[in-house]
Amino acid sequence: MSFSVLAVVGPTASGKSDLGISIAKAIGNAEIINADAMQLYKGMDIGTAKLGEESRQGIPHHLIDIVAPDQELTAVEYSKLAHDAIRQVLERGNTPILVGGSMFYVAAALDELDFAPTDEVVRERLESESEELGALALHERLKSLDSESAERIPAQNIRRVIRALEVIELTGEKHKSALPEPNYLRPTLQLGIEVDREVLKNRIRQRVEKMWAVGLLEEVQRFLELGVNFSRTAAVAIGYAQARSQLLGELSQQEAIDQTVSLTNRYARRQMSWFRRDTRIRWLDSEANLEKQALEQIRLGR
């Protein structure tokens, strides 16, 4: 299969960003498009492991720092931006490389998706109910209506719980059924990074501890001083709520770090569960040379 779009996916802390840059440098004339939902937000740098300009090694990056943390950017809006970015890279004669682990955003960028309907009145009512009854009550409601979605969506991610309930109410169908069988919008080669679970746990612990060491608290403190009210999407960024709780004296530093590690491990498991269902992905072994494996798959794909 000849492809026009490359993608590098996998769980958090698996090395996607570095591999994306290595591939871009090796094949030449390539540009990276971000598919990490939290790296879209300006100023959310340390907690999202966002690469700085120097670390990007001169490779053009798109869809990073495009919206303020107090603004909402839906998956539908991201889809349009990603499709435009991919088209523009191709028009320049370059290869777009989508890099990220935000599952639905990857699908929104690569696949033909018929997005489920939305209704502002229904959504606002569900949001009011979540404030009145609590996130757990809405998650229990979702479990009674669509147990598979409830298993995939954690109760603390109230934005996705509300979205699933909204789709069910508007369509009468389970949220999962709103996603069709995957079909690439353009010919795509999707590479996934497979990491041993214990190795990944260690990497996640090291990454989180480094975030605290290099200034996550100061980053969150600046947001607090500016009075920034995080949007629903930005508010679910793992690490930011924990750092805020530490600054407010609600958690010790060790408790904040441990909670962030635990939530990140849980998120990584959900990522792998999602990506493993996509039989189109060609998996790379993180214990071997990732760049060499990726370039071999690219050679075969061409």
Regions found by a protein language model. Name each.
Residues 1-302:
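Phosphate/pyrophosphate-binding catalytic cores of soluble transferases and nucleic-acid-acting enzymes
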